[in-house]
Amino acid sequence: MLRIVDVTSETTDDLRCAVPRADFDVDAAMAAVIPVCSAVRDRGVEALREYSEKFDHVVPEHLRVPVEALATAAANLDGTLRRAFSESIRRRRQVCQEAEVETSSQPVEVAGGARVSQRIVPVGRVGLYVPGGFAPLASSVIMNVVPAQEAGVSSIAVASPPQAEFGGLPHPSILALCHLLGVNEVYAVGGAQAIAMFAYGVEGSDEADSCPRVDMVTGPGNIYVVAAKRCLRGTVGIDSEAGPTEIAILADETADPRHIAADLMSQAEHDTLAAAVLVTDSTTLAEAVQRELAPMVSATLHSERIRTSLTSKQSAIVMVRDIDQGLEVVNAYAAEHLEIQTADAAAVAARVWNAGAIFVGPWAPVSLGDYSAGSTHVLPTAGAACHSSGLSVRSFMRAVHVIDYTEDALLELADSVEAFALAENLPGHANAITVRRSR
């Protein structure tokens, strides 16, 4: 089912091209998204209602979901699911509190009377997008809201597409999680128009049809959501331009082929453009994984979607000489999710530099991270893991340098600053120092 790519004779420079990504042309989607963003900017609520009818086939009574609907959704939660939600929230919050929070620095005295410090401050207001396409990704509520709360964001809004099945409200699981997390500002708006609503703000006849603009938008979405983020960055801050999900697994002969097959399928289930890549030095393992995949795919609910993903160009089994070359491949690929299923997996994982998240050993599948590991599942895709990080508390915080100099400290450095400014042909900069010299 998965094609075989043999790189055993390839050089390091060629490894980045071993497995191409799926075609995900955000620029092409911009042609459809720009008019949507412009319409929301110019016509506000009227445009949002038109796009709800066009794309979601339902028009909610109000843009903002009533608080009572959030409470009702939480009250109707199945007990097992409520416990699963609560445990996921607890673990994600603990990791945020103990591993991700940055604090302001003590002032650094670079000279007598010359102090510089760094103040860490949260973003003021954020809009968090939760998709509802192939599946209602309720887990994205946790992954976006919890780090924003732990960062100290004072105003949090959530948007998710209205569902005809639920009377124009977002999926009940999404509403229930918002209630459990204490988020009361929830909008039944989806797609690119939701990103535009957050970026520009809209004002209706009352609060139920109004949304103040935000400072930053985060959360996953389809290609049109990504295009809207690209279109509106600068008007509003964004977390990333995330593409289709991807999993890479570095494995040797000690790995269980059934585990490998199940994990590859788990991410292929998301999208026909999802990437599933096994990197191994074991022909025996590769053949066993192929045998396991066929019946698993046929028996699962989303078999056609998974089969399309696994047989497309973005998915493959990559054969390498040894685990050392396998590490070169996965570091060049920079997967969103990377599993290490080898002997001495922790030591191998320590040699990985480029990955959105690393899952170590046979008992840490990507599905665990998708829901309840305590880690984030909003991760860089398409190779961006070589320079970008997943969504965390730090994503919602800003570092502000505070410069505090006395008069003597400035005058001690005046000659240097004036010389620097004049060397750059910026006499106005120099003059701002000169006018402060004693007359």
UniProtKB/Swiss-Prot annotation:
Gene3D superfamilies: 1.20.5.1300, Nitrogenase molybdenum iron protein domain. Its cofactor is Zn(2+). It catalyses: L-histidinol + 2 NAD(+) + H2O = L-histidine + 2 NADH + 3 H(+). It comes from the Bacteria. One of its GO terms (biological process) is L-histidine biosynthetic process. NAD(+) binds at residues 129, 193, 222. Its EC number is 1.1.1.23. One of its GO terms (cellular component) is cytosol. Zn(2+) binds at residues 267, 270, 370, 429. One of its GO terms (molecular function) is NAD binding. The keyword Amino-acid biosynthesis applies. It is an enzyme of class 1 (oxidoreductase). Substrate binds at residues 245, 267, 270, 337, 370, 424, 429. SUPFAM superfamilies: ALDH-like. Belongs to the histidinol dehydrogenase family. Catalyzes the sequential NAD-dependent oxidations of L-histidinol to L-histidinaldehyde and then to L-histidine. This is Histidinol dehydrogenase.
